[in-house]
Structures are given as structure tokens and as C-alpha cells.
Design a protein with these regions (language model features):
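Conserved tyrosine-mediated DNA breakage-rejoining catalytic core shared by Y-recombinases
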Residues: 7, 184-186, 191-192, 225-261
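N-terminal helical hairpins
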Residues: 29-58, 71-79, 92-93
Length: 261
């Protein structure tokens, strides 16, 4: 089912297969040594016999990720925030480095090198996929381990679909996810909180900051509050605030992609 031909200083493995539509095709793969060609010949013949042969595909990592986002964002009804964050991660942290690589040619070693590159990459190196000119100070602020872990999580999910779509046999990611360095956050004490409130002159901002401190509300929860969420006539006479909704910044493109109507 497969044969080896010497072509100049290399060896080619020639075989026949059927594409996704059942159309007969011919495949050629070149190798530097005869041993490599023989090993590939054995593998191809085995895969053609047991049905595990992967139809050669030129899809790149960038094409895979855009296809995955398009399908999954609709299927799972992503929020505008999730969509925007995923697109930004693909544009700025993945495509500039491995976006042009063919999915079927990507190996675990390539991903390991990619993660190592990200660990040395400054924050904001790419914006909307365009490389930025950074100051010396900006270059010193590197991507966090959390950001690299998020890239790993996104790739793991996307490549799992590549396996389902018969593009690859297995996910080409390292067995262990990138380690996250947990940094303890600095929390304001009561003195700092009071000093901040005394500094703020804008009444609306003062109220928002006060509520975030006293009630531990997030920015989106505070901005989402309406008069109907306030009850000044509670039974205990203290009044209540009901947090029933949240507000978030949404990219116009995300809204149009998720709800074209």
C-alpha cells in the first residue's frame, strides 16, 4: 500500500488514501534517511489498515483557533467578556508565536519552547495582533504565570476538538500544565480605606468605593445596581441591597459576533 523511492539525496514514501469526501488521493513524504522512510512506510500501512490514518491537512494553529472560537462561542453561548478575552489571547499570546504552524506538525517540544518564550515576553508586547514598541520599563514587566496557564487551558480545549475532528491523534501539550506562582495580594487596612475615602471628592465615586469596601462588591455589581434593588423599608429597619445583576464592558465586535441579529 506504500512504497519508497530514492529521489536525489532523500527518500520519499508514496502511498494512496481517500480524503474526507472519499476521493482517491496520493501522498508523498520525504525523509533524509532510508531508515526514517522505512519506519514511516510501516506506520502509514498500519494506519491505512486499521482506519487510524489522518488525512493530510494544512490547517494552521491560527485557523484552528478561529474555527474553534466561532463554533464554541455560539454553541455554548459565551458572554461578550469570555469571547473578547479568548480572541485577545489568541491574537496576542498565541498567533504571533505559533499561529502559522500546521496543526498536524506541532509537537509537545514545540509547545514547551512556546511556553518558555511566553515566560520571557513582556506584557502588552502585542495588541490586536500588532507588535508594540515598548519602553525599557515596560519590557521588564513580563507575562504572569497565570496568563501562561490560561493559554495552556485554551489550547488544551481547542486541541481536544482537533482530535474530535480527526485532525490529530492526540493533544500535543505537555503532560503537566505550566506552574502558577501564587502571589499574596496586598489588602488595604482600615486606615488606608479611610484615607482613600477622604481623598475622593466625586460623590458617585465616593459611594461606589465605599460600597466596595463595606459590602465587598465588585465593580460590575456596583454599576449594575438600580433603585429597585434598594429596600429602605426592611422589617429590621436597616434596609437591604439586592445584587441581582452585573454590568461588564463589552466589545462591539463581540456583541455582533454573538448576536448578529
Amino acid at each position: 500500500m506504500a512504497s519508497i523511492m530514492k529521489r536525489g539525496d532523500s527518500y520519499s514514501v508514496r502511498y494512496k488514501y481517500k480524503d474526507y469526501s472519499g476521493k482517491p488521493c496520493e501522498g508523498w513524504e520525504s525523509f533524509k534517511t532510508k531508515k526514517e522512510a522505512q519506519e514511516r512506510k510501516i506506520t502509514v500501512e498500519k494506519e491505512l489498515l486499521d482506519g487510524s490514518f489522518l488525512v493530510p491537512d494544512t490547517m494552521t494553529v491560527e485557523e484552528l483557533l478561529h474555527k474553534w472560537i466561532s463554533i464554541q462561542s455560539t454553541k455554548h453561548k459565551w458572554s461578550p467578556k469570555t469571547y473578547t478575552q479568548s480572541v485577545a489571547m489568541v491574537q496576542n499570546l498565541i498567533v504571533p508565536y505559533i499561529g502559522k504552524r500546521k496543526v498536524q506538525e506541532l509537537r509537545t517540544y514545540d509547545i514547551e519552547k512556546f511556553y518558555a518564550t511566553l515566560a520571557r515576553t513582556p506584557c502588552g508586547q502585542y495588541v490586536h495582533g500588532v507588535k508594540q514598541t515598548l519602553t525599557d520599563k515596560q519590557k521588564k514587566r513580563l507575562l504572569s504565570s497565570t496568563s501562561i496557564r490560561e493559554v495552556h487551558t485554551l489550547l488544551k480545549t481547542a486541541f481536544s476538538y482537533a482530535v474530535e475532528w480527526d485532525l490529530i491523534h492526540k493533544i500535543p501539550l505537555p503532560r503537566d500544565a505550566p506552574k502558577v506562582n501564587i502571589e499574596e495580594r496586598t489588602i488595604w487596612d482600615e486606615k488606608t480605606m479611610l484615607a482613600a475615602l477622604q481623598t475622593i471628592e466625586n460623590p458617585a465615586l465616593h459611594l461606589a468605593v465605599h460600597m466596595s469596601m463595606i459590602l465587598s462588591l465588585r465593580e460590575g455589581e456596583i454599576l449594575g445596581l438600580q433603585l429597585s434593588d434598594l429596600d429602605f423599608d426592611a422589617a429590621d429597619g436597616r434596609g437591604t441591597i439586592s445584587v441581582s445583576k452585573t454590568m461588564q464592558r463589552a466589545n462591539k465586535d463581540a456583541l455582533e459576533k454573538l448576536d448578529p441579529n
